[in-house]
Amino acid sequence: MSEQGDQIEQVDVVEEVEVEAAAPETVSVEDALKEVLKRALVHDGLARGIREASKALDRRQAHLCVLCESCDQEAYVKLVEALCAESETPLIKVADPKVLGEWAGLCVLDRDGNARKVVGCSCVAVTDYGEDSAALQKLLESFSA
């Protein structure tokens, strides 16, 4: 064997990929909310369900609350609205509990990344936004307007 026979040269290949980001003006509030909930889920900053959300709101740990409009328990709606008003936490209402459950990660993803077996969710509170993003800025801007 030669002196260099066992050594293999390693070549690093670096590819630059340009990704076109959507302009903040073209992102709707609903899309921004979906992105913020996804980032909060990754950073373990979501309180899912009425029990966890009401605890987070009562402790004033919640930065944002999302409530389902079609919640059949009127007492739940009054409780969440009162806790949000007391702590001055922004409240967003969503029409479908299945959509909110999908955004909050209460589903199983198939091989293609499509949500299956989605569980409905009545309330979600964001306790940690995770990293700063354009979607978060758009959402916070919509609250101040």
Swiss-Prot record:
Example GO molecular function: structural constituent of ribosome
Gene3D superfamilies, alphabetized: 3.30.1330.30
Record's GO cellular component terms: cytosolic small ribosomal subunit
Domain of life (superkingdom): Eukaryota
Pfam families in UniProt: Ribosomal_L7Ae
Keywords: Cytoplasm, Ribonucleoprotein, Ribosomal protein
Disulfide cysteine pairs (residue numbers): none
Principal subcellular localization: cytoplasm
GO biological process: cytoplasmic translation; maintenance of translational fidelity; ribosomal small subunit biogenesis
PROSITE patterns listed in its UniProt record: RIBOSOMAL_S12E
Complex and partners: Component of the small ribosomal subunit (SSU). Mature yeast ribosomes consist of a small (40S) and a large (60S) subunit. The 40S small subunit contains 1 molecule of ribosomal RNA (18S rRNA) and at least 33 different proteins. The large 60S subunit contains 3 rRNA molecules (25S, 5.8S and 5S rRNA) and at least 46 different proteins.
Note from the entry: There are 2 genes for eS12 in S.pombe.
Function comment: Component of the ribosome, a large ribonucleoprotein complex responsible for the synthesis of proteins in the cell. The small ribosomal subunit (SSU) binds messenger RNAs (mRNAs) and translates the encoded message by selecting cognate aminoacyl-transfer RNA (tRNA) molecules. The large subunit (LSU) contains the ribosomal catalytic site termed the peptidyl transferase center (PTC), which catalyzes the formation of peptide bonds, thereby polymerizing the amino acids delivered by tRNAs into a polypeptide chain.
Family: Belongs to the eukaryotic ribosomal protein eS12 family.
Protein name: Small ribosomal subunit protein eS12A
